[in-house]
């Protein structure tokens, strides 16, 4: 869909959904892997409609992976958290923060950061972990790379976590050590930043403790 000079060939995923001239363009990066392909995010009124490649001769030229184009759908996914809850009930932001502060003060805290976070977010995540005297973990994602547009490291910013000092070594794909600490009652509160812990090796039963 990027090779048609007159726009006669278009993506079926985007076709007829929104007039292009209504959309706001924001420069971004592909979050599929650590390649960091340059992209443009097209949105209107807070809704993301598509992602297209942005030229960078040193990284991705004028291309991006097909799978990377579809990642925008995760933003509006039905199973994504869309409201603030405490113990399964709707809550205000202030109440949720107060509850979190109480739990952090009780100690035995672990912080799970994300390799999808920006450097600034990882810096703040480290500050939070340090303030809470918490252990720090990061979830690794590994997949097949093509050597061009997709790397085997499927996290876009593990390097940022290393640079900020949030972690000191490359992460594992499963949070085995954290799961063991939960079972041994060494960890009573987990702060997860943008990660689904059930995918990273913790069971629903462990998280309910």
Q: Which residues does each PLM region occupy?
A:
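Catalytic alpha/large subunits of respiratory electron-transfer oxidoreductases
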Residues: 1, 10-209
